[in-house]
Amino acid sequence: MAQMTVQIVTPDGLIYDHHAAFVSVKTIDGELGILPRHINTIAVLEVDQVKVRRVDDDKHIDWIAVNGGIIEIADNVITIVADSAERARDIDISRAERAKRRAELEIEEAHDKHLIDQERRAKIALQRAINRINVGTRI
């Protein structure tokens, strides 16, 4: 069976490194499903989940919350470089829910005070928190 190597790297180091049969990501241009021997590609990722179907167990799927970044696909090696990323098993759901509530309050406050930049940052924080919650509940 053909396989790919998937590596996810953040400023904190290597977060994920496994062989995969299939990978699904969301780019700014839409969903991208990746199988072995995929054409070489570079794309910008959305804040979303990465789905990795591992080679060692066809039923085993790893879910990773990725907060944007870049994906490079070259010669059956998938490299994702992101500001931050967390595997589903490492996500603290209660912490993510607190971050979500905090971001919602910040959005409301910034909107009321017409602070556009602060509102935009809070919306990004909300999107990241929701992504972490969605991925964290997949285990």
Swiss-Prot record:
Localization per record: Cell membrane
Primary subcellular site in the record, as a coarse category: membrane
Transmembrane intervals: none
Keyword Endoplasmic reticulum found: no
A GO CC term assigned to this protein in UniProt: proton-transporting ATP synthase complex
Annotated GO MF terms: ATP binding; proton-transporting ATP synthase activity, rotational mechanism
Keyword terms of this UniProt record: ATP synthesis, Cell membrane, CF(1), Hydrogen ion transport, Ion transport, Membrane, Transport
Membrane topology, from the record: Peripheral membrane protein
Stored InterPro entries: ATP_synth_F1_dsu/esu, ATP_synth_F1_dsu/esu_N, ATP_synth_F1_esu_C, ATPsynth_dsu/esu_N
Phosphoprotein keyword on record: no
Family: Belongs to the ATPase epsilon chain family.
Quaternary structure note: F-type ATPases have 2 components, CF(1) - the catalytic core - and CF(0) - the membrane proton channel. CF(1) has five subunits: alpha(3), beta(3), gamma(1), delta(1), epsilon(1). CF(0) has three main subunits: a, b and c.
Name listed for the protein in its UniProt record: ATP synthase epsilon chain
Organism: Streptococcus sanguinis
Lineage, top ranks: Bacteria, Bacillati, Bacillota, Bacilli, Lactobacillales
Gene: atpC
